[in-house]
Amino acid sequence: MSTAPKAPDFLVVIPARLGSTRLPRKPLADIGGKPMVVRVAERAKQSLAHSVIVATDSPEIQAACDEHRIECLLTSPDHPTGTDRIAEVAQLLKLPSNALVVNVQGDEPLIPPELINQVAQTLAEHPQCAISTVAVLISEPSEIDNSNVVKVVLNREGEALYFSRAPIPYVRDPQELIKTEHLRHLGIYAYRADFLQAYTRLDPAPPEQAEALEQLRALWNGYRIAVHTAPEAPPAGVDTLDDLERVRQLLGNT
């Protein structure tokens, strides 16, 4: 009799800062009486993670987490990316090199816990990879040419060849468009702890700077990224006031 694979041991880190440009003070936005970052942490706690930690440079966010009994670490205000902030957490916790760390964005209060489990499982099943992430098939043709929708092309092993805001793969013959799959990248990652420490020492890569996609730094330096193709897209995160109102209506006073 076959048995299901053992769930990997992992922790979730939620990077959160107040300096959002489109929606000021976004992590502290109220959703049914709780700050958004707390809502995200509560969703993450429904996953199989052994711990969930908010990483922030804001004493206000730390105080909000303390009030709701969410573990929080105060980190440096100088980190250029959320990945750098997570690397500091891995260092502060003295994580072993093979520890798995899942990065959940602080503006995803509706993230399915199963998706968090899946990105960790994907990395555990790909020992040759330093990172795992998630993609979903694009069903709306307009998204293919939308530069705000990041596309990814995979190899036959389910690893990322490239991420781009451009329409990749580019379909030269319009007759081939209907049978060409395009994948949308979703911004959830799992990392090995030793990669996180290496990442902080890597210089920004030319394609990363051109596309404004930090995952290209890993590919540029030869690190491999495993990609799970999800059967459907999760609920969208919160980028605008309209998004926030939508989530407030969905969660209400839960």
Swiss-Prot record:
Cysteine disulfide links: none
Instruction: Check the record and name the InterPro entries matching this protein.
Output: Cytidylyl_trans (IPR003329), KdsB (IPR004528), Nucleotide-diphossugar_trans (IPR029044)
| One Gene Ontology cellular component annotation held by this UniProt entry | cytosol
Q: Which UniProt keywords apply?
A: Cytoplasm, Lipopolysaccharide biosynthesis, Nucleotidyltransferase, Transferase
List the EC numbers from the record.
2.7.7.38
Pathway named in the protein's UniProt entry: Nucleotide-sugar biosynthesis; CMP-3-deoxy-D-manno-octulosonate biosynthesis; CMP-3-deoxy-D-manno-octulosonate from 3-deoxy-D-manno-octulosonate and CTP: step 1/1; Bacterial outer membrane biogenesis; lipopolysaccharide biosynthesis
The chemistry this enzyme catalyses reads: 3-deoxy-alpha-D-manno-oct-2-ulosonate + CTP = CMP-3-deoxy-beta-D-manno-octulosonate + diphosphate
Q: Mostly located where?
A: cytoplasm
Q: Which GO terms describe its biological process?
A: CMP-keto-3-deoxy-D-manno-octulosonic acid biosynthetic process; lipopolysaccharide biosynthetic process
The record's subcellular locations are: Cytoplasm
Q: Which CDD domains match?
A: CMP-KDO-Synthetase (cd02517)
Report the GO molecular function annotations. Answer: 3-deoxy-manno-octulosonate cytidylyltransferase activity
Q: Cite the SUPFAM superfamilies for this sequence.
A: Nucleotide-diphospho-sugar transferases
**HAMAP family cross-referenced by the UniProt entry:** KdsB
The record's annotation in NCBIfam families points to: kdsB, PRK05450.1-5, PRK13368.1
Family per similarity comment: Belongs to the KdsB family.
Reported function: Activates KDO (a required 8-carbon sugar) for incorporation into bacterial lipopolysaccharide in Gram-negative bacteria.
| Protein's name in the database | 3-deoxy-manno-octulosonate cytidylyltransferase
Per UniProt, what is the name of the gene that codes for the protein in this document? kdsB
